[in-house]
Amino acid sequence: MNKILEVENLVFKYEKESDVNQLNGVSFSITKGEWVSIIGQNGSGKSTTARLIDGLFEEFEGKVKIDGELLTAENVWNLRRKIGMVFQNPDNQFVGATVEDDVAFGMENQGIPREEMIKRVDEALLAVNMLDFKTREPARLSGGQKQRVAVAGIIALRPEIIILDESTSMLDPTGRQEIMRVIHEIKEKYQLTVLSITHDLDEAASSDRILVMKAGEIIKEAAPSELFATSEDMVEIGLDVPFSSNLMKDLRKNGFDLPEKYLSEDELVELLADKLR
């Protein structure tokens, strides 16, 4: 399997003099084309891990390899071109006067020819269903629309990895679902690898694999079907379980014959529809 991201024994603290590490020996790898989510309580080290991978902090112990190449101070700018990061607040990412200017900004910094830029801007905005808004001012967009434009700005750069750092946490449920639908479509279209940092367990449930962090360490790694099968394990970690898990538990109490394994919302709807036909 082709490992596009490898993290080995990351140790990091924000203050050199501090006795407290934000990360304590974090290690994992991600295969090309995989969608991996990192979940955990506030302060567990999720976002710190993501930002170290993106080269936003220079001093740390351990190794980060991107597409087989070791991340160093000398090559950080070149390797960062392989990563696109979507942050929590889209307003913090806007720099252009119009939507199309903003999507083009990163490409201008990379010296991409103008003809190619125009082509990529339209292609990226079309992919996130925002082409009709390309001359609009970003400030006049809704939260969900702003985040879609932020995603367009990333995919226009043609990265190999997209990191979502709590990128849906400021959206309402409808906006959150729309953004996740768009990113899933883009992932398949461009064969991207996705690392998602999230508090939303329903969002994490659509991942290929989930890493659970606590106090700067990865304490569990599993597929969603395994991790969410029992609510007791999640409560012990200090987290909730996805909506479908709680619903299945209540339905069993009311006499529904349901499997013990975890089912996503779509899978549960399909199963219940079959039973009620």
Curated annotation (Swiss-Prot):
SMART domains: AAA
Membrane-topology descriptor: Peripheral membrane protein
A family per Pfam: ABC_tran
EC top class, as a word: translocase
GO cellular component: ATP-binding cassette (ABC) transporter complex
Function description: ATP-binding (A) component of a common energy-coupling factor (ECF) ABC-transporter complex. Unlike classic ABC transporters this ECF transporter provides the energy necessary to transport a number of different substrates.
Subunit structure: Forms a stable energy-coupling factor (ECF) transporter complex composed of 2 membrane-embedded substrate-binding proteins (S component), 2 ATP-binding proteins (A component) and 2 transmembrane proteins (T component).
PROSITE patterns named among the record's database cross-references: ABC_TRANSPORTER_1, ABC_TRANSPORTER_2, CBIO
Location of the protein in the cell: Cell membrane
Protein name: Energy-coupling factor transporter ATP-binding protein EcfA1
ABC transporter domain: residues covered: 5-240
Species in which this protein is naturally found: Lactococcus lactis subsp. lactis (strain IL1403)
Main location per the UniProt record: membrane
Homology family: Belongs to the ABC transporter superfamily. Energy-coupling factor EcfA family.
MF GO annotations: ATP binding; ATP hydrolysis activity; ATPase-coupled transmembrane transporter activity
Coiled coil start-end: none
